[in-house]
Amino acid sequence: MEGATFSKYSWIDFVFSVIGACTFLVDWGSDVWLAAEFYRRGDVTWFWVLVGLMALSSFVVQTFSWFWFQYDRELPGFRAQTEAAAVLLGDRAKLSCAVHVLQLGFLCRHISAIRQGFRVWWRKEKGSEYAIYQTHDLSMLRLIETFCESAPQLTLMIYVMLHTHKARAVQFVSIAASTTSIAWMVVDYHRSLRSFLPDKAKQGWGSSLIYFLWNLLLIAPRVAALALCASVLSGYMAAHFLMLWSAFALWAWRQGTHFMDSVAGEWLYRATVGLIWYFSWFNVKDGQTRSRSAIYHSFISTDGAILLATWWCHRDPVQTQSYALALLIALPLFHFLGLLFKALYYCCFHPKLWRPPARDPGLPNDLPDAQVSMRDFPIQDGGLSPKLLNKRMAGQVARFYSDE
């Protein structure tokens, strides 16, 4: 496969940045509203669970954002690039630290991406490279937030509905919207990865639809099975999560991940990967991806079947009579369809064998990544000057589009 051929920052990138920021604000507002509803109704336990999920998600996302800011500051070309593009916060470490401590780093990244994108797309100013660089980081942060907050919250929403045996139409709409949003965020992340590929391999509507469907059909039954089992054995589900999350984090460690530039950052990444794997597959290492994916899906399918069988055996036959049999049939069926759509995607739509562009031949082979300038990656786009390469996302691309 050819090397990367980046497009210039376009109005589509700007629209996605605006939608991402609006989604973040709406999601934050809905979380606050839901927490207030729990508190008003006297559901103190669920109130604190929801607040805890919000706090944990915010802490994880802000920590990733701060780590990346620190890593980027060590790159030789960072200050020159940010000053030339008049980037918000730029190289101001103290201000950036204060913003992240106040849990506003992710929001500032959204504002910076919109501001930079508007200057580049509408005013035709310089800085297209850094605008694209920012969108790549945001796509990864949104994915992390999705599985640290949105997926657990969706599980909680379904659990509350099952536990109370009360369901309103607005709850079904909210659950459907949340599930769709989670699958869409995975597609958005995939779209960001695809931007590194040659133009002929850009993600089309057909590819996006298949990718969306297999994620939707695998994530939805997983979340439903977790909520169903929690509705009858809530205490055991906490132990279930801790055991699987720990095992998944150790599996990520055994695979030798190298996404972050520090030991602490890498362990945070592995812990986050463990949380993502609790809900959905996420490739973290190139080579032999097919075998690792098969192991994961075999385990998750078995675990899901056990969860569903446990719920069936311990449920209240009277309270669940109207929907129990339908769920028992539908959830495994959706899961199986999701696996079929995933196989279809990898057979017909998935590019392979991409590798990040090589460093400048004049650089020493043993030079640490942190000492490689942003301009040391000679990526060309026609007659344009070399462009910035987001090493973090480029590494993810190499792993995701490796030969399976």
From Swiss-Prot:
The record's Pfam families line, in alphabetical order, gives: XK-related
Q: Where in the cell is it found?
A: Cell membrane
Keyword DNA-binding attributed: no
| Chemical reaction(s) catalysed | a 1,2-diacyl-sn-glycero-3-phospho-L-serine(in) = a 1,2-diacyl-sn-glycero-3-phospho-L-serine(out)
Keywords, ordered alphabetically: Apoptosis, Cell membrane, Membrane, Transmembrane, Transmembrane helix
Top-level taxonomic group = Eukaryota
What Gene Ontology terms describe where this protein resides (cellular component)?
plasma membrane
GO:BP terms for this protein? apoptotic process involved in development; engulfment of apoptotic cell; phosphatidylserine exposure on apoptotic cell surface
The annotated topology with respect to the bilayer is: Multi-pass membrane protein
What stretches pass through the bilayer? 14-34, 44-64, 169-189, 209-229, 232-252, 262-282, 293-313, 324-344
Main location (coarse class): membrane
Q: Which InterPro entries match?
A: XK-rel (IPR018629), XK-related_scramblase (IPR050895)
Q: Family, per the entry?
A: Belongs to the XK family.
> What job does this protein perform?
Phospholipid scramblase that promotes phosphatidylserine exposure on apoptotic cell surface, possibly by mediating phospholipid scrambling. Phosphatidylserine is a specific marker only present at the surface of apoptotic cells and acts as a specific signal for engulfment.
Instruction: Write the protein's name.
Output: XK-related protein 8
Q: Supply the source organism's classification.
A: Eukaryota, Metazoa, Chordata, Craniata, Vertebrata
